[in-house]
Amino acid sequence: MFRYMLAACMALMPFLPSGAQATEVSEFTLDNGLHAVVIEDHRAPVVVHMLWYRVGAADEPPGRSGIAHFLEHLMFKATETLESGEFSDTVEANGGSDNAFTSWDYTGYYQRVASDRLGLMMQMEADRMRNLLLTDEDITTERSVILEERAQRTDSSAGALFNEQMRASLYLAHPYRIPIGGWRHEIESLGREDVFSFYHDYYSPDNAILIVAGDVTPEEVRALAEEHYGPLEPSGVEPRERPHDPPQIADRRVYYEDPRVSDPYVVRSYIAPERDPGNQRTAAALTLLSNVLAGSGATAVLPRVLQVEEARSLYAAASYSGTNLDDTVFSVFNVPVPGVSLEEAEADLDRVIAQFLEDGIDPEQFARIQFQWEAEMIYAQDDVGDWARMYGVGLTSGLTVQDIQDWPDVIASITPEEVMEAARMIFTETTSVTGYLTAPGL
């Protein structure tokens, strides 16, 4: 199996950037505090322009959940120089595409265009950073849009509602407990003054990270950034201060019934450490732990035992994402076959994890997982948008450019012993929430 993975990885190599293209990453900071990162890739005359703000759903004022996502939508309205909707129309007219996104730690905006259109993208992005105009009609219309978006993505999904309740139970005080899109009753009360206050507090060059990836040079990017972003005044935004959870001393349980559920499942989530600047080994060990437990199909611990050997599970998995500003989540899941209760499915998870903690990691499986992870990292480098996104997420989560560049080497250096140490640290019920999602009568 290992040699086939090696052959597959080698087959990818002709399609990868050359070493110079893949590793030419530079950074600079303008006098107004704008941090810029340039990723050179000269294979095609295309550029990805991203502007990331160090503000997200976890930075919203109490009682105003959803405002970060709301503002993301409103940023496509009129400015002092553009009509409502003209931003995206201009990108499209120049043969490009654009979008935006919100998470707990960041809000981001991006455009993919021909490299000779980069200056125009900066001009428009700098304009809406400080010159957004909003009418009461804009607020009313877009609030209806995001409420409908919540209805479609969350309220109509039993799994999404269940996940909201799980996070709200897992985090006791930290704002990661609040949905990215906000609670419906708080979205309904958001007004124009709320939005403008948030906009003026956080949308400024000293709270932004510019990522440009593609057919550009650092000198070109700096000249354009100085021209378009340089004149903007900084706001003096303070470093983020968030409430943190007290010590967690008891496990919690969530039981949610919904008639729309067809496949009941049990999930247990644990508070877990994130990647820290200069200290990523624990997060790397947890990344590999999630892969050992569930990341390599039928050979991973949970699916191998529960799905293949015992046929007691339709699906068993683990998940972990360490790129957060604050403590993150490690989860294990089990969707039992019909006839196996959720109580039994939970016991199955506990049993398999306990056996794993006793037996340790199979060395051959661990070598395969590390190699597969490295191959996936190499493959991801083939798209400049993925590169830009990786740096944007990392930097807005508190990492440095060096941390992001070091990550593959950190992963490659992790030992099985470190993974087992991370497993023993994480699998303590005092920091966990166990949830059952089921339907009435099941």
Regions found by a protein language model. Give the residues of each.
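Bacterial N-terminal signal peptides
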Residues: 5-17
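Mature N-terminal segment immediately following signal peptide/propeptide cleavage
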Residues: 22-52
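M16/insulysin-pitrilysin zinc metalloprotease superfamily fold
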Residues: 78-81, 112-143, 296, 322-380
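An aromatic/glycine/proline-enriched structural segment found at the starts
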Residues: 172, 180, 205, 209-276, ...
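A structural supersecondary motif
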Residues: 267-271, 294-336
